[in-house]
Amino acid sequence: MTLSMYHYIEQTWQNKDWRRSILRKRLIEWRRQPAITRIDRPTRLNRARALGYKAKQGFVMVRVRVRRGGLNKPRPNSGRRPKRMGVYGYGPSKGYRWIAEERAARKFPNLEVLGSYYVAEDGMYKYYEVIMVDYSHPVIRSDPELKWLQDSVNRKRVFRGLTSAGQKSRGLTKSRGLKGTVQRKWKKKQKERQLKRRHEATRYYRLQHSGRKIPGK
């Protein structure tokens, strides 16, 4: 079977030597640019075409830079234990790709988000490319595959969690449930804390009936 051009593009992106040499130079240039930058063409053509991108009028490509890490929460002035400060260990309740889509939609309010994909990351930022469509353009209105964007029910769809990134963060993807979402991680961590408290509370009882020496006795 003959492999398509997009197969070789994907192999190029998976090549570590290529990522160290060429992509590193691009990251240095991208960091100097604004956080939301309009670009002429998609960087990963195979991913863009898989999400519905077409090289025609009405399509706009935007590269968004999102800061990595947890939330930058203010440190309280009143005294308390460091673990109760509520500063560290808190991350955003949304995925970074969803945040990038919302920022692009606020930058271009006359466009609708069709999809997005991951591009690259460095020690401080993550970079995503968002596919945006001008639903009022005559070329888009006459396209049978894209004219659904002009319906009023699809306005501001990114802010209602209707994109792929939004559905993933909400745990609505098929045969996935909450697996891999932020909600599942917090539920798992909460369950671990409850088991740990229960374990520490019964430690003295377990040591007393096991015949082992109880610390401090």
Swiss-Prot record:
InterPro entries: Rbsml_eL15_core_dom_sf, Ribosomal_eL15, Ribosomal_eL15_arc, Ribosomal_eL15_CS, Ribosomal_uL23/eL15/eS24_sf. GO terms for cellular component: cytosolic large ribosomal subunit. Residues 171-200 have a biased composition (Basic residues). GO terms for molecular function: RNA binding; structural constituent of ribosome. GO terms for biological process: cytoplasmic translation. Residues 165-202 are annotated as: Disordered. Keywords: Ribonucleoprotein, Ribosomal protein. Pfam families: Ribosomal_L15e. HAMAP family: Ribosomal_eL15. Belongs to the eukaryotic ribosomal protein eL15 family. PANTHER family: LARGE RIBOSOMAL SUBUNIT PROTEIN EL15 (PTHR11847:SF4), RIBOSOMAL PROTEIN L15 (PTHR11847). NCBIfam families: PRK04243.1. This is Large ribosomal subunit protein eL15. It comes from Sulfolobus acidocaldarius (strain ATCC 33909 / DSM 639 / JCM 8929 / NBRC 15157 / NCIMB 11770). The lineage of its organism: Archaea, Thermoproteota, Thermoprotei, Sulfolobales, Sulfolobaceae.
